């Protein structure tokens, strides 16, 4: 069996800068450091190339590997509030942006590649982004919007609730891969 911990990056700074360059806040750095002991036994660590994800991974594990395809969904030209709409229609996308289905395929390809590199019995930490992770989970889970204004979701796997609320920074999911 192979195990992946799929984690959202820690708390980012607020500010006006390109999405991929947003660093962790001081609170986010402290939260990431607090996770180091929990993940001290991971064999490998992979990260989105976005700064906040890389910083999270670097605070938790030694020598994270950057995987370009783990980046956050490309929003494009958002002319309307699209957060709820993307969950109502997984093919919806803003001009120049990605749909949840496109992100799901990209993330699944990246994670399948990571799992393919792992040896039996290994554990990996994968640091990415809330929407990208949720898009990946659409391959296996039901996702229902509970409160669009607060970006709250209910995620269920085979009828069992695994998240009900906001996907918090430095939180995530444990995924087991058997007989791949």
Residue locations for each model-derived region?
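Acidic, low-complexity terminal tails and accessory targeting/binding regions
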Residues: 72-82, 88-89, 120, 138-180
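Phosphate-handling substructures
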Residues: 60-109, 163-167
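Glycine-rich phosphate-binding loop signature in dinucleotide/nucleotide-binding domains
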Residues: 39-41, 114-122
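Generic beta-sheet signal
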Residues: 4, 120-131
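Active-site signature of alpha/beta-hydrolase-fold catalytic machinery across serine-
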Residues: 59, 135, 139
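Active-site-proximal alpha-helix that buttresses catalytic centers in soluble enzyme cores
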Residues: 2-65, 95-101
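Short beta-strand scaffold positions
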Residues: 47-48, 105, 127-128
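Short active-site segment of divalent metal-dependent hydrolases/proteases
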Residues: 12, 132-133
């Amino acid at each position: 069996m192979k195990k992946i911990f799929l984690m959202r990056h820690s708390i980012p700074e607020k500010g006006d800068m390109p999405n991929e360059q947003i660093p962790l806040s001081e609170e986010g750095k402290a939260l990431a450091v607090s996770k180091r002991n929990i993940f001290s036994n991971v064999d490998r660590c992979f990260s989105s190339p976005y700064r906040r994800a890389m910083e999270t991974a670097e605070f938790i594990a030694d020598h994270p590997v950057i995987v370009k395809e783990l980046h956050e969904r490309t929003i494009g030209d958002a002319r309307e509030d699209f957060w709820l709409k993307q969950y109502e229609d997984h093919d919806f996308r803003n001009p120049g942006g990605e749909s949840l289905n496109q992100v799901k395929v990209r993330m699944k390809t990246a994670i399948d590649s990571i799992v393919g590199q792992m040896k039996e019995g290994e554990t990996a930490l994968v640091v990415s982004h809330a929407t990208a992770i949720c898009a990946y989970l659409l391959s296996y889970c039901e996702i229902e919007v509970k409160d669009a204004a607060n970006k709250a979701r209910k995620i269920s796997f085979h009828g069992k609730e695994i998240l009900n609320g906001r996907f918090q920074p430095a939180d995530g999911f444990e995924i087991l891969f058997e007989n791949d």
